[in-house]
């Protein structure tokens, strides 16, 4: 009997697929039954090999070995995952296996994970592709009923392979180049470095910001407060105030304009991460991990998507989920809700996967039984589906302009005509433990009294209010994700192909690398570049730090995935950049050679030259290279007395020439005693010590 080998990205997904297909025979590293062998990768089982695989000369980080440009790329199995790779290879080569199904995540990285294993295992059997956006049993069965020819995804694999090779070429060469030049490991990445540049640019804008005072003159006109434009001079504002109080204000225009605020779009991954950061303070990685966990529990659709629409054939599915949400979510109790589902359906705006929404599995789940963080994300996605299909928010914007003392004053108001989707948002926000800061414009406007053109106010009450210009805010993960998403778009048509730094699936990992590498740090919800982060950006060329250039690469990778761009041409450009980097950066920048030199704490001053003394692994040494003063930790004097030469003892010797030490061992008597060690430096190659016995 011919068997079908199914390979998932991780064990939990393999188990879900097996359950949906009724496969129950657990074996070592796979599940068997019903004509299926279902196994799994454990993330990236196979990766591009390290530089040393291309020759011993690349084992050490040396400038003269750069650039490293492989002619034939090598691959390496993760040594910690070798057993599972061996299992997959054996299963692929079983004579009773007729075809292999790629059931890894339906996206660029999932394609790469499977293809690397398939290629390195030397498998030649036909490939099929499972491409689904939900882990519900019905979706899995439907996916297996309509498997695609794996070769239809060759362009997607080409894009993934180009991405991996580009990251390798830039990462290996730039990291080694600048690390050797500046004497410190400096991790440079194709996406992470321009992302760091965004943080340092914002930090610089804050540091260089000059606060300025400005003033408004405000008139009280029978319940309407009208304000002047900004006035930079206090005396000018005071003079205007006096003139107004002695004069007359006349309404020169009064307009009402009906406006509509459309409902928000459904979540793609980046917008979900932004909102979860703003509301709950979750990092981008935390949100992705939570969404992935919910996906694997069949409660949420595939999270790594860049689409905010559903396909045209999902109307009935969406309607069923909305009905379920109205029953399950407490804040919808008693709300009569008729969704406008058509506004979230648009197959033309769905690429690989549709927007993130809950699934019908919610019917079988008690929300209260979920971990709080997972419940928060699931409820957030549910609330967004309801808001996105609700009526628009309709309001009337009222503007009144008054003339007084030759100056215009403006009063603005807002009257809500229909809450629409904002009523759902308000109900949802009311359930949150901590209330997020309102978004720009959420609280704007007040109700103005009825006014008419020509209406006048004699000697109106006036006041001067003082204000200060505010600097830009540090990036939060929410704002940084937005900046990464918009990078390279410029003033292009909003419906044009988006570029951006990274992809929805990779942005969280980029941020984590910056934090773990010590180039950025979290302070509450803020992301701040560290001193090393700012220093790194200061030494790197624009070709490595430009968000626009990296966004163009990401756009090229998207075109390669569509079969519309040449992979070879793309990689040739990356290789040329690696060559140019090495050729144009043969030495450290003037004055910046010691930029990353860490100041070691001093334990005291050198008794010979007065320079700071530092602790090394084996000694305490003078920082002045011209001075020979050094105290060795394994000095025979201390070893004979069975006493560790600690930094505390060394500091005391440097400070006063003496250190009181308890329980010194006497080689003569075999007993211990308390004594004072005296530094007896003769200025020679070695430092001597002697004992002063403490008398009781």
Model-predicted regions and their roles:
Residues 1-164, 168, 471:
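Intrinsically disordered, low-complexity regulatory segments
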Residues 2-5, 103-106, 183-185, 256-265, ...:
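Conserved short loop/turn motifs at secondary-structure junctions
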Residues 2-5, 81, 92, 120, ...:
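Basic, low-complexity terminal or inter-domain segments flanking catalytic cores
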Residues 11-18, 35-38, 42, 78-89, ...:
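Amphipathic alpha-helical transducer elements in NTP-driven molecular machines
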Residues 126, 196, 300:
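Conserved ATP-binding/catalytic motifs of P-loop helicase motor domains
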Residues 137-221, 256-260:
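C-terminal or mid-to-C-terminal helical accessory/interaction module adjacent to the motor/catalytic core
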Residues 235-267, 273:
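Metal- or metallocofactor-binding catalytic centers and their adjacent structured scaffolds
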């Amino acid at each position: 009997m011919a068997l079908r080998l199914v390979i998932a990205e991780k064990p939990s997904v393999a188990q879900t697929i097996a359950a949906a297909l009724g496969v129950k025979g657990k074996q070592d590293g796979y599940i068997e039954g019903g004509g299926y062998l279902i196994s799994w990768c454990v993330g990236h089982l196979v990766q591009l090999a390290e530089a040393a695989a291309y020759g011993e000369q690349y084992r050490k980080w040396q400038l003269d070995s750069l650039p490293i440009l492989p002619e034939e790329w090598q691959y390496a199995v993760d040594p910690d995952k070798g057993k599972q790779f061996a299992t997959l290879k054996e299963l692929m080569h079983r004579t009773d296996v007729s075809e292999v199904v790629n059931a890894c995540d339906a996206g660029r990285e999932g394609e790469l994970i499977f293809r690397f294993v398939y290629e390195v295992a030397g498998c030649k059997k036909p490939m099929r592709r499972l491409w689904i956006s939900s882990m519900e049993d019905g979706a899995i069965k439907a996916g297996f009923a309509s498997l695609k020819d794996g070769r239809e995804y060759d362009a997607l694999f080409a894009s993934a392979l180009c991405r991996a090779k580009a990251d390798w070429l830039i990462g290996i060469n730039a990291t080694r180049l600048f690390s050797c030049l500046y004497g410190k490991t400096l991790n440079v990445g194709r996406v992470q470095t321009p992302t760091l540049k965004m943080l340092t640019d914002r930090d610089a804008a804050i540091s260089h910001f000059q606060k300025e005072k400005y003033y408004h003159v405000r008139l009280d006109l029978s319940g309407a407060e009208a304000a002047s434009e900004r006035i930079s001079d206090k005396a000018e504002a005071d003079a205007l105030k006096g003139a107004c109080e002695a004069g007359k204000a006349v309404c020169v225009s009064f307009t009402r304009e009906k406006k509509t605020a459309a409902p928000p779009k459904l979540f793609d991954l980046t917008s979900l991460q932004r909102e979860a950061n703003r509301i709950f303070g979750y990092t981008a990685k935390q949100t992705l991990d939570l969404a992935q966990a919910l996906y694997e529990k069949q409660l949420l659709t595939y999270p790594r998507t860049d689409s905010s629409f559903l396909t045209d054939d999902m109307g009935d599915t969406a309607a069923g989920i909305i009905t379920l949400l109205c029953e399950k979510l407490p804040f919808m109790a008693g709300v009569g809700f008729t969704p406008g589902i058509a506004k979230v359906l648009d197959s033309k705006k769905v690429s690989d996967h549709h927007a993130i929404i809950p699934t019908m599995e919610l019917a079988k789940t008690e929300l209260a039984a979920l971990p709080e963080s997972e419940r928060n994300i699931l409820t957030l996605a549910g609330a967004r589906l309801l808001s996105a299909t609700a009526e628009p928010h309709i309001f009337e914007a009222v503007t009144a302009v008054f003339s007084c003392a030759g100056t215009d004053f403006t009063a603005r108001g807002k009257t809500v005509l229909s809450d629409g989707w904002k009523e759902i948002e308000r109900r949802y926000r009311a359930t949150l433990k901590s209330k997020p800061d309102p978004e720009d414009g959420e609280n704007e406007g007040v109700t103005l009294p009825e006014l008419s053109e020509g209406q006048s106010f004699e000697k109106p009450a006036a006041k001067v209010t003082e204000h200060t210009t505010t600097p830009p805010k540090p990036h939060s993960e929410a704002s940084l994700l937005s900046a990464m998403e918009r990078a390279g778009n410029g003033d292009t048509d909003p419906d044009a192909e988006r570029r951006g730094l990274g992809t929805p699936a990779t942005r969280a990992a980029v941020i984590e690398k910056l934090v773990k590498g010590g180039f950025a740090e979290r302070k509450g919800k803020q992301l701040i570049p560290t001193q090393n982060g700012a220093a790194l950006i200061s030494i790197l060329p624009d070709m490595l730090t430009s968000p626009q250039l990296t966004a163009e690469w990401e756009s090229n990778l998207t075109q390669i995935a569509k079969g519309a761009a040449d992979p070879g041409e793309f990689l040739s450009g990356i290789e040329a950049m690696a060559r140019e980097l090495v050729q144009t950066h043969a030495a450290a920048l003037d004055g910046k050679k010691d930029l990353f030199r860490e100041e070691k704490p001093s334990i005291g001053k050198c008794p010979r030259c007065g320079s700071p003394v530092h602790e090394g692994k084996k000694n305490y040494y003078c920082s002045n290279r011209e001075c020979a003063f050094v105290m060795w930790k394994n000095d025979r004097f201390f070893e004979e007395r069975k006493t560790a030469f600690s930094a505390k003892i060394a500091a005391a010797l440097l400070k006063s020439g003496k250190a009181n030490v308890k329980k010194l061992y006497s080689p003569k008597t075999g007993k211990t005693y308390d004594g004072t060690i005296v530094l007896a430096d003769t200025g020679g190659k070695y430092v001597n010590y002697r004992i002063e016995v403490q008398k009781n």
